[in-house]
Amino acid sequence: MRFTKYIYLIIYAYACACLPLGAQNDVLAAQKGVIKGGYDFWVYTPADYETTQDSTPVILFLHGASLCGRDLSRVRRYGPLHALQMGRNIPALIIAPQNPGGAWNPKKINDVLDWTLSHYAADTTRIYVIGMSLGGYGTMDYAGTYPHRVAAAMALCGGCTLRDMQGLGELPLWILHGTADRAVGIRHSQTVVEALRREKNDQRLRFDWLNGQSHGALGRLFYMEKTYDWLFAHTVADSGRVADRLITITNADLKQAYRNITRRKEPMHVK
């Protein structure tokens, strides 16, 4: 229900306001080789995790092609992990797998999620997926394959490889793409929107074509508080699983993406 959504947003805002940067003890843990034949990944736990465990939301971040490989540190170059490094407070358990190359595999992503939830407590009704470029494809492929597991998904300048996109209509999905994207043309996202609308399966879909924005410009969304506000406004327990349409993202927001981030006084603990 909408009331429940805003309770979560109030809790999120309170957490952002109450954690002094100087007292942070958040942890970023590398998980290598723990899933046979699967992805290596990072797991981030926020500063207050010890007291919030079962109520902690989960964010799955899927990177683009430039971060593919076997060097897990590359996954920290942009996205939520880099936003945390810059000083953005994100009160969530963040899972960031590394794709060694090729398309993201929904089953392997799900294996990473399963492993993490078997080792870390979290709110399993509040699992979110966000990805950019190749990761935007991965976001839609994963959300469309496991729609009942994902509370909301945000796909940036990506597309979808699923032949059956029915699942994408079963959860709140926000697709964003720049009209000046020369790396992954906007048609990749438009095709998904058209397919869902054609099947009248777009009731939970949001899409925005950001005029004049390039491929890389959408990476700024990872640093914006609004991005996480929108994700956290949803839970799989919501009646009807309605997509929030009050939060907007504009070119002006992208321009100011870094302006209200307070630089960290201490680095996160990496292990």
Where are these regions (language model features)?
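Post-His helix in hydrolase/transferase enzymes
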Residues: 218-229
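Catalytic histidine neighborhood in serine/cysteine hydrolases
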Residues: 196-217
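Active-site machinery of serine-nucleophile hydrolases
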Residues: 55-58, 62-110
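Short beta-strand/loop motif that positions the catalytic acidic residue
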Residues: 174-177, 181
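A domain-start/cap signature at the N-terminus of enzymes
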Residues: 21-58, 137, 142, 154, ...
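Short alpha-helix in the alpha/beta-hydrolase fold that links the catalytic acid
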Residues: 73-75, 185-195
